Amino acid sequence: FLLVSMMIIVSIATRSGMFNWIANELLRFTKGHPKLVLLTLGVFTAVTSAFLDNVTTVILIMPVTFFIAKQLDINPLPFLITEIFSSNIGGTATLIGDPPNIIIGSAAKLSFMDFLTELTGVVAVILVVIIALMLFIFRKSLKAAPEKMAAVANLDNSKTITDFPLMIRSGIVLMLVILGFILHDITHVETCVTAMLGASFLLLFEKPKDILCDVEWNTIFFFIGLFIIIGGLEATGGIALMAKWILAVTKGSQEATAMIILWASGFISGIIDNIPYTATMTPMLLEIQKTMGADYTLPLWWCLSLGACLGGNMTIIGAAANVIVSETSAHNGHPIPFMKFLKYGVLTMIISLVISSA
């Protein structure tokens, strides 16, 4: 319900042009300097991904990226690769930023503020380091003629907002929903209820049929089917056996167990989608929690979140946002070679996990 409600809120807010307007204003601020553009796109993508799903974020930012690259007459790949990394990094910071976190938060009863308190600091450090790394790696590509930069600096943003009342309405609802998430520990209102109230209010002013068509029902039913399969594994005792095996290998050491979960999650999530992986690991951690207690397991949840979300940066197929950017880029005449992305992705993931391990 949380995922469906947030998809509805984001779909309605997007129709107003709000996110494109924000992105364009930030880009005007850069005055067209390619390095500042990369920095701005990276930070904007990360912050937006903390509150919207990664796929929605990259879909919003890509048209702006291609427009800017065309105006500056430079290759858009440095921007696009940075946006992929930033979307996965930023999505790690909050409960609603990435589907694995929604799964973890629901299973472990972790609140929006729990994620914000525990993960935002390390995510911010990782983001700074990775954007600095991208600026260094692509330094030779990030050059543009002065007259090209002037075109971006004078970007007309006056017609980006297509529905001003809708922007105000959806913006207020989005802020109130996020505030509700933050105040969860005080109000004790479930995050899914808060999101559903916000989505229901916005639907009063829209045609529900049109909005519901924008919901990614394939993803929702994928989740439903996945949880049924995981429930079967749990009922047959398969999950309990996995939990006992991990504790036997680490001899019950919390630090060793945490490091195994962090690094294994990173590499596995780079090869397969992080959603089914997280859905499989979650009941296993709950089994460990039954044996070792909640205090022992709490750091393991954060390791699972960091590993699963950040591991998506390893390959071009590691996360749904990566695939969307890759396909769109190819359609626009700028394919992202698998091996080229892997070269940057492995480095990005290893640096991210090293920082997470510290």
What are the roles of these predicted feature ranges?
Residues 21-22, 101-114, 183-189, 236-251:
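Membrane-interface helix termini and inter-helical loops of multi-pass transporters
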Residues 35-43, 57, 80-81, 116, ...:
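Hydrophobic alpha-helical transmembrane segments
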Residues 44-53, 84-96, 180-186, 263-277, ...:
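Transmembrane alpha-helix interface/packing and boundary motifs in multi-pass membrane proteins
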Residues 23, 56-67, 80, 94-108, ...:
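Re-entrant/interfacial helical elements at transmembrane boundaries that shape
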Residues 1-15, 120-244, 336, 343-358:
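Hydrophobic transmembrane alpha-helices of multi-pass small-molecule transporters
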Residues 1-74, 217-219, 224-292:
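Membrane-embedded alpha-helical segments and adjacent helix-loop junctions characteristic
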Residues 116-126, 256-358:
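C-terminal transmembrane helix pair
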Residues 68-147, 294-296, 324-355:
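Membrane-core helix-loop-helix motifs of multi-pass transport proteins
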